[in-house]
Amino acid sequence: MPPPQSPGWQEPAVSWLLDHCPSDYRGYPGWRKNPVALAWVAVRHIDAQLEAMRAAYREVRVDLGDLVSPQALGQIQSDLETEGLRLRASARAARLVFEALQGKRYIPRL
């Protein structure tokens, strides 16, 4: 994605945000016409996914411990952890896009 405030940066930002939402969101014209609204809902969607992964990680041993092998359980926990990390990064990035669409500038900390 090009840096915010560069010419045409919002179009790739909209595509990126839609990639992080359910595919049905591509059918709603309001999201494309109002990128800040898309970013707003994308942040909420990603946050909900992250909370679901956290809950699954907390509950997987109790809910699946008797249904899958110990090796499978370990792999499932690892997969949930990996997905949680991916979602954390996506949530941070979506928040930065949301802020950029509001005209806020990112200032890295030293």
Regions found by a protein language model. Give the residues of each.
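Eukaryotic low-complexity, intrinsically disordered regulatory segments enriched in serine, proline
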Residues: 6-110
